[in-house]
Amino acid sequence: MRRAAAAAVTVTTTTRMAAEGMSTAAAAAEATATAAPAAGSRWGRAWPSALRWIPTSTDRIIAAEKRLLSIVKTGYVQEQVNIGSSPPGSKVRWFRSSSDEPRFINTVTFDSEENAPTLVMVHGYGASQGFFFRNFDALASRFRVIAIDQLGWGGSSRPDFTCKSTEETEAWFIDSFEEWRKAKNLSNFILLGHSFGGYVAAKYALQHPEHVQHLILVGPAGFSSETEHSSEWLTKFRATWKGMLVNHLWESNFTPQRIVRGLGPWGPGLVQRYTSARFGSHSTGELLTEQESTLLTDYIYHTLAAKASGELCLKHIFSFGAFVRKPLLQSASDWKVPTTFIYGQQDWMNYQGAQQARKEMKVPCEIIRVPQGGHFVFIDNPSGFHSAVFHACRKFLSGDGEEGLSLPEGLTSA
């Protein structure tokens, strides 16, 4: 029975987290963008989309998502999960505000076999759940797959970002995810997070280990810290005019998405050039088809150009140079959930940080490297990525935990 499951260290590193190589463009156009009718405003909605400076809206995000997911053969249910407006004890300002406006988490749940283990997938910075479009069919054959847009990204609600500290910013993502879990009535699930989503997933598992059966971190942020050498380099760089400019942009919370908005109707062209380069000429693995490239480009544009919200976490989570302010390495000894790290062999995220964390962990931990894959290994080498996930979850898939103990061919252990 099937069910519809309802430099070395510079700001360049952060730009790669947001769009992994998106070209820099003049941000002066941002001033023009703010003067034009916003896509989400009442005045903006009255304009035909073709005449808006930023031609997007929440409806267009969801429409682009549906077009992208039309590639997926497995049936699914898309829903906006209401997470309320004021979870008790939250550290986030908007949760404590007088506004009773509910918040929603955009969620897609794929058809699965009865009693299949639940796999929850969390996207990275500047991305959304649709980035996993090449993985849903294969993973849904073994799991009950649920993918979400984190609060402030994709088709989820985009509240004004009022966080003023690292603690409050982490709570923005962790508390909203916990409210989503309650609304979905999930108790035991496998949690997979990519890049910044891996950071959020790990922080969530540290606070709520009772709900997470296994943690899969794909090229996660948060496992590197500022070394003495890089600190010296940054000090010297800040003293230059370029360093002062970059530092000013960082402290102003300038994000790559602002470039896309600032370009207005020319933004889609920039995104198209990025997609063609990252998943085409510069790809380390399986190239996108023409259809995939067109649909993914359209989807990425609408998710990046929409109202700034979750993206503004940047300076509170990362210090200048893209080092996390609260490295997960500091919490490795407190880990309570068995963990698997997955890295593409060409991933610019350093897997040595995971090796260092493993030494401190008191729970089972393995590190798998997938060939022909970069930071978006699940797009670059889908079959290799699926093999790594199935291997990581062999205990839940085989029933007795004894089958498939050897690493699948092509994968390597670090």
Swiss-Prot record:
Listed GO biological process terms: lipid homeostasis; phosphatidic acid biosynthetic process
Gene Ontology cellular component terms for the protein in this record: cytoplasm
Annotated motif GXSXG, positions: 193-197
A GO molecular function held by the record: phospholipase A2 activity
Assigned EC number: 2.3.1.51
Compartments in which it is found: Cytoplasm
Record-annotated AB hydrolase-1 domain positions: 117-382
UniProt cross-references to Pfam families, sorted A to Z: Abhydrolase_1 (PF00561)
InterPro entries from the UniProt entry: AB_hydrolase_1, AB_hydrolase_fold, Epox_hydrolase-like
Motif mapping: HXXXXD motif: 375-380
Enzyme class label: transferase
UniProt keyword annotations, A-Z: Acyltransferase, Cytoplasm, Lipid biosynthesis, Lipid metabolism, Phospholipid biosynthesis, Phospholipid metabolism, Transferase
Catalytic activity: a 1-acyl-sn-glycero-3-phosphate + an acyl-CoA = a 1,2-diacyl-sn-glycero-3-phosphate + CoA
Domain notes: The HXXXXD motif is essential for acyltransferase activity and may constitute the binding site for the phosphate moiety of the glycerol-3-phosphate.
Annotated family: Belongs to the peptidase S33 family. ABHD4/ABHD5 subfamily.
Function: Lysophosphatidic acid acyltransferase which functions in phosphatidic acid biosynthesis. May regulate neutral lipid accumulation and participate in the regulation of lipid turnover in vegetative cells. May possess additional triacylglycerol lipase and phospholipase A2 activities in vitro.
Name of the featured protein: Probable 1-acylglycerol-3-phosphate O-acyltransferase
Species annotation: Oryza sativa subsp. japonica (Rice)
